[in-house]
From Swiss-Prot:
It comes from Aquifex aeolicus (strain VF5). Residues 1-76 form the Carrier domain. Keywords: Cytoplasm, Fatty acid biosynthesis, Fatty acid metabolism, Lipid biosynthesis, Lipid metabolism, Phosphopantetheine, Phosphoprotein. The keyword 4Fe-4S does not apply. The lineage of its organism: Bacteria, Pseudomonadati, Aquificota, Aquificia, Aquificales. This is Acyl carrier protein. Gene3D superfamilies: ACP-like.
Length: 78
């Protein structure tokens, strides 16, 4: 499973949205219906899945699915 697929899987599971709606441009809050707690839980799920720590200042910059994919590629490769 590619990094992108793993990210989509986590988002679909955490937010209960269909994978078809999870595009790189999709914003967690506006497009996928996440609230601030959902976003925190997503960040924690990404940290656990990929074995990294995402500092708060980085987490605040992650607004879209593409943002998190690019961030994770930078940190873990993929």
């Amino acid at each position: 499973m590619s990094l992108e697929e793993r990210v989509k899987e986590i988002i679909a599971e955490q937010l209960g949205v269909e994978k078809e709606k999870i595009t790189p441009e999709a914003k967690f809050v506006e497009d996928l219906g996440a609230d601030s707690l959902d976003v925190v839980e997503l960040i924690m799920a990404f940290e656990e899945e990929f074995g990294i720590e995402i500092p708060d200042e980085d987490a605040e910059k992650i607004q879209t699915v593409g943002d998190v994919i690019n961030y994770l590629k930078e940190k873990v490769g993929g």
